[in-house]
Amino acid sequence: MTLRLHALITGAALFLLSFGGSALADGIATPWQMNFQEAASPVMERIEDFHNLLFWIITIITLFVLILLIYVIVKFNEKANPVPSKTTHNTFIEVVWTVVPIIILVVIAVPSFKLLFFQDKYENPDMTLKVVGHQWYWSYKYPDQGDFGFDSQMVQAEDLKPGQPRLLTVDNTVVLPIDTNIRVLQTADDVIHNWAMPAFGLKLDAV
């Protein structure tokens, strides 16, 4: 299958793509973690900023709806309001609940599109990494290094050493230089595979 260019990663501290060993403890999720991993790229930093913006918008909307529901339950229950209102419409309220959501969507859309366009920016690569997905392992090649390559397979649970994370430890890890722009050519040998680096805000389907 022909390799396709899926991503151009600009990394300030890209060290490895697969996890294995205690030295990687800071690069994986931790028990009861409530937030993202520490951002390792400008893209992930912007994703976090956008996530935080959405979090506060959603929180405010949720609290407003909750307060409104409580108010309606208390004020318009049968005991407090034995004679129900026969009001059919309220122009002001209808305008408000139309205009306010539009404003909220615009506030969300502007940074969202900025983030999308920012993710499409790239610089000329300093080196290339070929990634091929298989059932159930990855193959990596370094075209700039004489097409050197190897397979990277997950270490089974019974073979894990103390401190090695389950489902994240592999027998051969990918090592890349820091402060280097790296182009990733990605494809799959059989079915669709997903290749991800959460700290870099990167998640791609290998086809």
Residues of each region from the PLM?
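Hydrophobic membrane-targeting signal helices
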Residues: 15-20, 69, 106-112
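Alpha-helical transmembrane segments
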Residues: 62-75
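Active-site-proximal cofactor/substrate-binding loop regions of enzyme domains
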Residues: 58
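Non-transmembrane, membrane-proximal soluble domains of secreted or membrane proteins
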Residues: 26-53, 73-207
